[in-house]
Amino acid sequence: IYYTDDNIISYALDLSYPTIHLNINNEEAISLEDNLNKRMIKAKESIVKLSDVSINKDDIVYEIGSEDIYEADFFKYNTLNGDDYLTLEVSYGHLNITKEEGATYLEYYTFSKDTGFLLSDEEIKKIGSVTDDDIAKSKEKYESANEVTIEKYQLYLDKYANVKMNVLVNNGHITYN
């Protein structure tokens, strides 16, 4: 996985919009790369400049210096590179300089380095010797400890091939990862 055209918009707000290249030659990876790049373009098009809005400067909660960003969708990547597996973490959300950080959503895509294909949750469970009962117990424990409802989950492998579970939860007021 590599990136081009970084398109750094704001250093202070850590906003950049790179083009991702998965460098895996199968339809699944090509389709994912195309989808992610389209989403990145859409996020970049969401930028609203501070000079285009009328706000009280005292409402700004971020240190932005002289940068001219009021709000924007963000879209970021992180790679978890293990011996046999490669997981792409995609984080996205919306930033507004007059509000504390909003919800950030996460998606994970785990590839087998041997085959180049995305792994399903079933394949990930098998690799990590994780059962459906293990997942049910983890969900129940998390929901009970945090007084939330897990709306959905996604399994992925970290760089050490440990099975991890990304959860989308609802606490009765907001939904978040």
Mark where each language-model region is.
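Compositionally biased intrinsically disordered regions enriched in Thr/Gly
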Residues: 1-177
